[in-house]
Amino acid sequence: MVDHDVRVEVAHGDPSSTLVVHGEVDVSSAGVLEAAIAAARDGGCREVVVDLGDVSFIDLAGLRVLHLAAVDGLGVVVRNPSRLARRVIGLAGMTDALPIEGDDEVG
């Protein structure tokens, strides 16, 4: 999936899929991430691992997409968050809702 601001590479698996996000996830591009998550769910995925290592910007619209997927029953795990993504997750108070794989500190 490609947008001028964000690109999401998807590796489908069973029961989880990995989404590698590149670029900026904001109010204008969060729909790309939302569509990738929906496609994974529609494909039978029960968990998504979202790699945010190459995210140069993420705002609350991007976190909202991840949070709503988790609230809706999909397992959501954040992997390799960029420094900015890690900070935004911490500042938004979403460390419990969006666990970071292999990480004990956010902020």
Model-identified regions with their sequence ranges:
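STAS-like cytosolic regulatory interaction modules
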Residues: M1-G107
